[in-house]
C-alpha cells in the first residue's frame, strides 16, 4: 500500500471522516494521503499541513457555491512529480515541445480551460470570503438537526421514514438521507419538486458501495442537503 484516498464527508449519510487521525496514520506509515472534499470545501476548515494531506480535491458547485462543471485539486510537488497526466494536449505554454509541460499547473491542464466556469467560481469565492465559514457551518448544522428532529417528531418509530446515518450533528455535514418505506422514493422526489419546488437527490448518489455498507442498496435513498441560504421555514414545508 502506497496511497490512502478517502472522502472527507459522505455524500450519502453525511458522516465526516477524521482527517487528522487518518493523516497522522499515513505519515507514521509513510503513505501518501489524498482527501476528497467535495462535500466539505467551503463549510469545514481543512489544514493540509496539520492533516498531512498530499493532495486535496474539491468541486466548485457545492459548498463553494460556484457553477457546475468546476473543481480542482491542490497537490504537493513531490506527488505531482510522480503522476502522469491523464490527458495530454496543448496548454498554450512550452509550445515548442512535443511533451506536456513538467511545471504546474500546466502539466494537468491541457486544452482550453472552462473560463466562464472559472470566472463564476472566482466570483463565488469572493462572495464566500465575505462570510464566516464557521457561521455557515453552524447554520447548516442547526438546519440539519432541526430537520432530523422534525422527522423523528412526525414518525418517532421510523415506520414511514427511515433516517440513514446518525441522528445528531456530531461529526456530520448538512446532508440527510432517508428511505420512504411506503412510497417509491423517485415518486416522492418528483412530487417534492413538481408540487413544492423542493429539490432532492434520489438513488445511489454515485456511491453504490456506501449504500451497500449502509444497507440501502439497491433502492438507494432520498437525500436532502442544506446550505447557508436555507431557512427553517423551508424545512417546515419539506416536513409537512
What is each model feature region?
Residues 1-240:
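Pyridoxal 5′-phosphate
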Amino acid at each position: 500500500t502506497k496511497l490512502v484516498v478517502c472522502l472527507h464527508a459522505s455524500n450519502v449519510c453525511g458522516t465526516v471522516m477524521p482527517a487528522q487521525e487518518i493523516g497522522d496514520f499515513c505519515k507514521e506509515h509513510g503513505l501518501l494521503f489524498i482527501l476528497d472534499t467535495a462535500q466539505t470545501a467551503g463549510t469545514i476548515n481543512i489544514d493540509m499541513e496539520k492533516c498531512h494531506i498530499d493532495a486535496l480535491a474539491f468541486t466548485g458547485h457545492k459548498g463553494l457555491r460556484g457553477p457546475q462543471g468546476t473543481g480542482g485539486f491542490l497537490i504537493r510537488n513531490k506527488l505531482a512529480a510522480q503522476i502522469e497526466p491523464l490527458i495530454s494536449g496543448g496548454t498554450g505554454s512550452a509550445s515548442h515541445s512535443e511533451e506536456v509541460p513538467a511545471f504546474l499547473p500546466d502539466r494537468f491542464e491541457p486544452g482550453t480551460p472552462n473560463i466562464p466556469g472559472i470566472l463564476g467560481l472566482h466570483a463565488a469565492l469572493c462572495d464566500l470570503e465575505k462570510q464566516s465559514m464557521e457561521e455557515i457551518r453552524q447554520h447548516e448544522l442547526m438546519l440539519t438537526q432541526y430537520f432530523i428532529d422534525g422527522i423523528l417528531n412526525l414518525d418517532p418509530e421510523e415506520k414511514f421514514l427511515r433516517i440513514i446515518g446518525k441522528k445528531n450533528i456530531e461529526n456530520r455535514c448538512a446532508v440527510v438521507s432517508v428511505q420512504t418505506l411506503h412510497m417509491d422514493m423517485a415518486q416522492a422526489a418528483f412530487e417534492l419538486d413538481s408540487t413544492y419546488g423542493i429539490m432532492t437527490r434520489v438513488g445511489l448518489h454515485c456511491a453504490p458501495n456506501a449504500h451497500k455498507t449502509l444497507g440501502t442498496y439497491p433502492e438507494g435513498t432520498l437525500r436532502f442537503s442544506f446550505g447557508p441560504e436555507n431557512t427553517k421555514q423551508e424545512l417546515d414545508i419539506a416536513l409537512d
